[in-house]
Each structure stands twice: as C-alpha cells, then as structure tokens.
Amino acid sequence: MKKAGLLFLVMIVIAVVAAGIGYWKLTGEESDTLRKIVLEQCLPNQQENQNPSPCAEVKPNAGYVVLKDRHGPLQYLLMPTYRINGTESPLLTDPSTPNFFWLAWQARDFMSQKYGQPVPDRAVSLAINSRTGRTQNHFHIHISCIRPDVREQLDNNLANISSRWLPLPGGLRGHEYLARRVTESELVQRSPFMMLAEEVPEAREHMGSYGLAMVRQSDNSFVLLATQRNLLTLNRASAEEIQDHQCEILR
C-alpha cells in the first residue's frame, strides 16, 4: 500500500511539473511568433503589395493564411488573420467563424506543390493541439503527413468508427482518443469544433483541454479524433503526435 501511495504521489509531481513546463512555454516571448508573422508580415504585405510572403497564401476576406512551417519538408500551418489563441476560444463554436478545418483540408494542395507530385489524401492529416499541448498562442492547424503506424491503426479500425463520438479501441500513441466518422458534406456544413462542443458531454466548458485531428479514410469519409488533457497519464492533448513531419509514409 505504501508503495502504491508513493507511486501515486510521484505521478502527481510529474503531472504538476509537466503542467508547469507547458505554462512556461506559453508565457515566453516566442509564444507570439506566429501571430506576429501573420499580423505584422503576411497580412500587411498582401494588402499593400499583393504579395503573401512570408506566407504561401493570404485570404483576408476568408479570414485565413497558409504558412510553410520550418519543421518538415511538407508541413504547412493554417491560421486566422485575426486574434484567436486556440481551442479554448469561444469564437470556434460561433457559426459565423470560418470552418478552419475544412479550409485546412483544401490547403493540403500546398503539400503536393512542394512535393512536386500529388500527395495521396490517405497520407495527409490535420491537427491542432490543446492549450497545454501547444507552444504558440495563435490558433494554427498543422497540415502534414500522418504517421504510418497511426494510418495502419485507423485503417484496421475502419469498421469500429461510427457517426458518434466513441473511444477509439487502443487509443493512439499511448493516449485515449475519441473518434467520429463524418462525411464530406457534413464537414463542409459544420465545423469539427462545433461537433465536439455540441456532441461530447461537458466538452463545451473544457474546449481548451482538447486536441483535435482529422484524417481521410479509404471509403472517402473523414475521421475526427479528439484527445483530452490528462496530466496523470502525461497526456497534454497534443494531437500533433499523430503526425510525421518527415513524411515517411511517402517513401
């Protein structure tokens, strides 16, 4: 019993330290780097010179930009042209807010352009990290390759993923995930953030604790993946963990 109690105490300490590290990352000066790039470089350059640089694309009327990330040969980021911190923002459950996940899916074409040939949809994944799982305080969806092992696991669970949010058997990367199948028409009409907030009990009150990802399945449907922060299991809800920015799946 004493050993069990000690182990539990150690886990608590580790969780607190992990939370502290996450908070430290978010309070450093570099946590505003992406926001400054969008608001002070990409947007003004597009408006004044019709040049999106350093972004790959700037769409002021649609409310988003696409930026080549410095990590990985094919990774891009989709970000709003205005201030949204992350998954905790109530703007994401406002129907008037752009459907950023759908826009990010359209932006996957930048991967193919960079690669020099079409990148199969099955190799693409989208991910946004939770408040404690991110290092930047400007909303950004990672557009990148999926890890081959995650791709295989999702393929094997194709029949187990329904149109309701249910636990994904075995989880992913050692963490628990909820999975939900959506059609393309559903995705066009309704943001995954709204699906999560409206369909998962108590999710709306804790949106900042969730990381969210999206992958296309072999039947042309999409699967949404949501993981919630759980510091006792060292899960910071960094949905980006399903991605491989080196794109081994293309080799």
UniProtKB/Swiss-Prot annotation:
Highest taxon of the lineage: Bacteria
Name assigned to this protein: CDP-diacylglycerol pyrophosphatase
InterPro entries: CDP-diacylglyc_Pase (IPR003763), CDP-diacylglyc_Pase_proteobac (IPR015993), HIT-like_sf (IPR036265)
Pathway in which this enzyme or protein is active: Phospholipid metabolism; CDP-diacylglycerol degradation; phosphatidate from CDP-diacylglycerol: step 1/1
Main localization category: membrane
Compartments where found: Cell inner membrane
Keyword Lipid metabolism part of the UniProt annotation: yes
One Gene Ontology term, aspect cellular component: plasma membrane
GO terms assigned for molecular function: CDP-diacylglycerol diphosphatase activity
Any Pfam family: CDH
Reactions mediated catalytically: a CDP-1,2-diacyl-sn-glycerol + H2O = a 1,2-diacyl-sn-glycero-3-phosphate + CMP + 2 H(+)
Membrane spanning residue stretches: 4-24
Membrane-protein topology: Single-pass membrane protein
Annotated S-S bridges: none
Keywords: Cell inner membrane, Cell membrane, Hydrolase, Lipid biosynthesis, Lipid metabolism, Membrane, Phospholipid biosynthesis, Phospholipid metabolism, Transmembrane, Transmembrane helix
Family classification: Belongs to the Cdh family.
Gene from which this protein is expressed: cdh
Source organism of this protein record: Escherichia coli O127:H6 (strain E2348/69 / EPEC)
Entry EC no(s): 3.6.1.26
UniProt keyword annotation of Transferase present: no
Annotated GO biological process: CDP-diacylglycerol catabolic process; phospholipid biosynthetic process
